[in-house]
């Protein structure tokens, strides 16, 4: 029986086998990817050059945008290539690398969202101490935790994936390499890997989501005690955008990973993964900027400076 090291490449079955839809999908997802890059890289640049955006909230937001760029870029280019290719293959090494970065960036993002919730708690519940407690040094330390932890956990998970055995079926029923479809085509004793995947995902999503929920529960209590209606409105507006992003980001991976990888669940997971890997990274810059007065002012100032220089 061949083991995982005997595999040289996998075939990605993708979203559809209908040739007439593949060109349409290519155009749509290419447009989505371009908008994702433009929006998130634009957000990073805007935050770095705008004096009014030099606060912890926007510092963390720039890292969320960076994670979104990494997340989308890990999946979309290969998906676009396979939509126009007849072979639709991915190398063994490429599959492991894609698995590694996918798991890593997912964990980075969920904990960045938790850090952002904690930051909003500090700003809303401890406004007088916010400047001293959330110094630049503290922010750097807080944001380093998701990166170190995410890439460390991903290394362990990917090494476990490396130990899977395959018995001649090298077709992955997905448009990128991920644990659920790989487990589905693996043979031998895969139940330990299944349980490990569910436990790791469950622990991390539960812990990070608990930080978010506790932070926002305390924020709501603090906001309701405010006497100023404008203050309450501003606080809820700022928190609303973050809660929207949290709801979208946590909901889809929970649906994908906290189930046994059956054929039906993998098919459903593909549809969810399209939203998760392409649409959410595109929407995040819009969610955080459309109702944000500071971001709008920064954009207007940046545009004005550009025209003045010309």
From Swiss-Prot:
TM regions (residue ranges): 24-44, 53-73, 98-118, 138-158, 195-215, 236-256, 270-290
UniProt-recorded Gene Ontology molecular function terms: G protein-coupled receptor activity; odorant binding; olfactory receptor activity
Disulphide bridges, residue numbers: 95-187
Membrane topology: Multi-pass membrane protein
InterPro entries: GPCR_Rhodpsn, GPCR_Rhodpsn_7TM, Olfact_rcpt
Sorted UniProt keywords: Cell membrane, Disulfide bond, G-protein coupled receptor, Glycoprotein, Membrane, Olfaction, Receptor, Sensory transduction, Transducer, Transmembrane, Transmembrane helix
Residue intervals on the Extracellular side: 1-23, 74-97, 159-194, 257-269
Location, primary (coarse class): membrane
PROSITE patterns for the chain: G_PROTEIN_RECEP_F1_2
Any GO BP: sensory perception of smell
Glycan attachment positions: 3
Annotated localization: Cell membrane
Family: Belongs to the G-protein coupled receptor 1 family.
Function: Odorant receptor.
Protein name: Olfactory receptor 5M9
């Amino acid at each position: 029986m061949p083991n995982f090291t005997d595999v040289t490449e996998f075939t990605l079955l993708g979203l559809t086998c209908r040739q007439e839809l593949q060109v349409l999908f290519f155009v749509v997802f290419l447009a989505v990817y371009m908008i994702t890059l433009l929006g998130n890289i634009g957000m990073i640049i805007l935050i770095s050059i705008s004096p009014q955006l030099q606060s912890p909230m926007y510092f963390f937001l720039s890292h969320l945008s960076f994670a979104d760029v990494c997340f989308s870029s890990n999946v979309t280019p290969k998906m676009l290539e396979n939509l126009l290719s007849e072979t639709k293959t991915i190398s063994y090494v490429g599959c492991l690398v894609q698995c590694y970065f996918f798991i890593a960036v997912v964990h980075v993002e969920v904990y960045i969202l938790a850090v952002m919730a904690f930051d909003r708690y500090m700003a809303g519940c401890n406004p007088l101490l916010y400047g001293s407690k959330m110094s630049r040094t503290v922010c750097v330390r807080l944001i380093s935790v998701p990166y170190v932890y995410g890439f460390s956990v991903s290394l362990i998970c990917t090494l476990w994936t490396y130990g899977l055995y395959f018995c001649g079926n090298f077709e992955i029923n997905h448009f990128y390499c991920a644990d659920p479809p790989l487990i589905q085509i693996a043979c031998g004793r895969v139940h330990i890997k299944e349980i490990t995947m569910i436990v790791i995902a469950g622990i991390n999503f539960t812990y990070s989501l608990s930080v978010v929920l506790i932070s926002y529960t305390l924020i709501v209590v603090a906001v309701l005690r405010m006497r100023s209606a404008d203050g309450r409105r501003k606080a809820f507006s700022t928190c609303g955008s973050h809660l929207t992003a949290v709801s979208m980001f946590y909901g889809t991976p929970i649906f994908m990973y906290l189930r046994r990888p059956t054929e039906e669940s993998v098919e459903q997971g593909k549809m969810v993964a399209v939203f998760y890997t392409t649409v959410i990274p595109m929407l995040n810059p819009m969610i955080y900027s459309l109702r944000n007065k500071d971001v709008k002012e920064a954009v207007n100032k940046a545009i004005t400076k550009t025209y003045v220089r010309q």
